[in-house]
Amino acid sequence: MTEKFNGFSHDEILKITGVKEGGVGKRPASLEAAKPALRIQPGIRRMPDKIFRQADQLRKQQQQQPQQPIQKPDVAKKTKSGTATPTEKPPTPTPAAEDDVANGSLNLDRPLSDSLIEALYHGNATARDKKTPATYADAETTSTDDSSILKISGGDSQTTSSTDDGSILPSTQDTSPRERLNTDSPFKGISLKDFEQHRRMIEEQNKQKKQMLYQAIEQHTQKTAAESRKIEEIRHELSKLESDLAVDVALLRKQIDNACIHFANVEKQYVKIEAQFLRAKIELHNASEKKELLTEHLCTVIAHNEDRKAQKLTELMQKVGLSPTDDCQPIDLTQQSP
């Protein structure tokens, strides 16, 4: 499609509704006479039943809420004309209502978006008509025909109810000249067939986008699960390494403790043996000195004994009258000894 759907032209709407050019606010002469002419019009379809069910649920919810007292006829006339007294103030939208409207416009499960409803029914929706996505049927003041794909904008000024809900006729209530149909729609100039094709294409694109989103979410979920498994495996390996390291460290610490104990015992033995060695060495040195002293003393005793013996023999020879010869003189060992 090269062109956007700009809505139905004014001539097509007048041809379908049966309203003449000069009489916008006038009703057809006969409702029954207009039905056969409108039934043969091609391309007009009933709105989905889902929207009707939503409208019925909305009516029930509004009826269950605490209803305000019934307005008097003069107040109803003021409501029709769209004017209000200076003392009356229009209701101000609350933040909760604005949040509900914003959340409703983002709902992907809805059959029609707000912009599409505005294009089909009212063109650019005014602030008076922007209440909820299905507030085109007001249970308190209006009861309009919701079975037509076309809807002449009447807002709150439509007070007469339609007796034929299954008819394809649009709403035939009286409208003021200033509330004429707004045909400035973005889908103006495109037939219903092209609009249906465009709608189906948009729905197919939305389905493809949803499928792509679901696939992306599934891939992200699978990727996250795989990363979680990898992280869990890494944690398991790290815990295993830490446990093996703890076992090895405990074993080595035990061996080191045993080696320390053995080293202490050997060191004690070494110190003891070293002390014994020093003691034995000292004893050996003392014994050697004592041996030398005793040997020297023995030699001295022997030498002195020989000297005394020689002197005694000399004295005895002199008493006898023998003279000792030179050869028999005693040898002084003390002089020869170094």
From Swiss-Prot:
Where is this chain compositionally biased, Low complexity type? 60-73, 153-167
GO cellular component terms, A-Z: centriole; centrosome; Golgi cisterna; trans-Golgi network
Q: What is the effect of changing residue 266 to P?
A: Loss of localization to the Golgi while retaining localization to the centrosomes
Region Necessary for interaction with Sas-6 and essential for homodimerization, residue ranges: 260-286
Ranges of Basic and acidic residues composition bias in the record? 1-14, 46-59
Q: Does the keyword RNA-binding apply?
A: no
UniProt-annotated stretches for the region Necessary for localization to the Golgi? 246-323
Record keywords, A-Z: Coiled coil, Cytoplasm, Cytoskeleton, Golgi apparatus
Region of interest called Necessary for localization to the centrosome, as start-end residue ranges on this chain: 246-286
A biological process term (GO) from this entry: positive regulation of cytokinesis
Residue ranges of coiled coil: 192-244
Location comes to: Cytoplasm, Cytoskeleton, Microtubule organizing center, Centrosome, Centriole; Cytoplasm, Cytoskeleton, Microtubule organizing center, Centrosome; Golgi apparatus, trans-Golgi network
Effect of knocking it out? Viable. Loss of daughter centrioles and asymmetrical mother centriole-derived basal body results in defective nine-fold symmetry of cilia in neurosensory organs and therefore motor coordination defects. Plp-associated structures are also disorganized but ciliary structures are still present in the scolopale rods. Males are fertile, whereas female are sterile. Results in failure to duplicate centrosomes in embryos and diploid larval tissues.
Q: Which domain of life is it from?
A: Eukaryota
Essential for Sas-6 binding: annotated segments: 244-260
Any one Gene Ontology MF annotation carried by this entry is:
identical protein binding
Q: Where is this region: Disordered?
A: 1-109, 127-188
Q: Spell out the family assignment given in the record's similarity comment.
A: Belongs to the GORAB family.
Q: What does this protein do?
A: Required for centriole duplication likely through its interaction with Sas-6. During embryogenesis, maternally provided protein is required for centrosome duplication and nuclear division cycles of the syncytial embryos. In femoral chordotonal organs, required for sensory cilia structural integrity and functionality necessary for motor coordination. In male germline, has a role in cytokinesis which seems dependent on its localization to the Golgi.
- What does the subunit section of this Swiss-Prot or TrEMBL entry state? Homodimer (via C-terminus); dimerization appears to be required for its trans-Golgi localization but not for its function and centriolar localization. Interacts (via C-terminus) with Rab6; binds Rab6 as a homodimer, this interaction seems to be required for trans-Golgi localization. Interacts (via C-terminus) with Sas-6; binds as a monomer to a Sas-6 homodimer.
Q: What is this protein called?
A: RAB6-interacting golgin
